[in-house]
Amino acid sequence: MGGRRGPNRTSYYRNPLCEPGSSGASGGGHSSSASVSSVRSRSRTTSGTGLSSPPLAAQTVVPLQHCKIPELPVQASILFELQLFFCQLIALFVHYINIYKTVWWYPPSHPPSHTSLNFHLIDFNLLMVTAIVLGRRFIGSIVKEASQRGKVSLFRSILLFLTRFTVLTATGWSLCRSLIHLFRTYSFLNLLFLCYPFGMYIPFLQLNYDLRKTNLFTHMASMGPREAVSGLARSRDYFLTLRETWKQHTRQLYGPEAMPTHACCLSPSLIRNEVEFLKMDFNWRMKEVLVSSMLSAYYVAFVPVWFVKNTHYYDKRWSCELFLLVSISTSVILMQHLLPASYCDLLHKAAAHLGCWQKVDPALCSNVLQHPWTEECMWPQGVLVKHSKNVYKAVGHYNVAIPSDVSHFRFHFFFSNPLRILNILLLLEGAVIVYQLYSLMSSEKWHQTISLALILFSNYYAFFKLLRDRLVLGKAYSYSASPQRDLDHRFS
């Protein structure tokens, strides 16, 4: 009923989607069918500002129609690790050609060598250690597959046990034998240069336990002689941290349960919790990509050069170029495996549920209705809210993100477009391939020609898989774009 407006008239409103503490779950598999009317309140118009906040009673939260992408074939973990190990061995082989090449085509009257490489200068113990380090992921995947539990036949269980025993015994014996020889041959500085990247491996990948919160390093650094007994317990806690970190590392790499799932729910708190978990999972995968790629490039390009004699000449520029090529190529291959098309689609769904807020100038919206932001509400598009003495405008269809949280803004920015990650990887891999083709055409040295031609094959395969995923996802989202636009028009 039309009452008289007055300065003391109070404007009441209800939550846009749900009352505080309530939660809902969609039952439609790939759609969130929650068309809910929002807050009823009066809005004051502006004159000349260009900003408006329509009455929430006239707005609705548009239901999200998630695109169902086709199931793309996923490469088995052990096959992927074999492919990656093979590519790294090729890069190591071509680098040894660069270092120990000879002029074997000279006539016998003045030959420095009768072979294409100076094999007598190669330290095969160092080569064995490098190969084991590069193949650590492949060895771990074999042991993981051979350690599977379940109801298997007696013959299969014996075969799995023998496989695991053979792989671990051969790897351990070869590694110990080579390390003993290296300790007897080289100085402590050389051995430190060989092993120090592993000193940063576990702390960099540490995820489940925050060492700064538990103060393990602080306690161990400040431990006095009277604290030997308590220091033993703290060291046990530290080794427990390393063990749990390694367990998370192997589960993330080789376990079939490593891929998270999307809970298509309507509870703002559950959506934010899901986003926090996905952020942690994505950061873990990026850490794994960064550490593995840099470790591979380090042992392929730098370790063989460090142990070369001072009187031996090699092309330093090509070694640095090979380091960049190996690090970028390994990063793209790992990201293509750890961030498949289904994972990109999962992040996109979570970003669509999270929404985003755009900070606006309070002077431009002083005469526009501004609602106090509450964490248990799902805000529709175009609403202005107040949070932390700032004014924000809702951008997404669903908006449950914290307006002042920069991590929520970054998550929505990167993953609101499901093709952004694949586009970046395609551009990066395409640039590497173009550069390698240009270097191959302009190369005048036989060892560089062989090196570029061999490395190109691994990049071709990675580019093909990325292009396939990009085309499939692009087609799937283009088909679902028109029904979503019709649905937006119907509810607007």
From Swiss-Prot:
Segments for region (Disordered): 1-53
Pfam hit, one: Tmp39
This protein's name: Transmembrane protein 39B
Glycosylated residues (UniProt): N8
Annotated function: May protect the cells against DNA damage caused by exposure to the cold-warming stress and facilitates tissue damage repair during the recovery phase.
Encoding gene per record: Tmem39b
Subcellular location: Endoplasmic reticulum membrane
Primary location class: endoplasmic reticulum
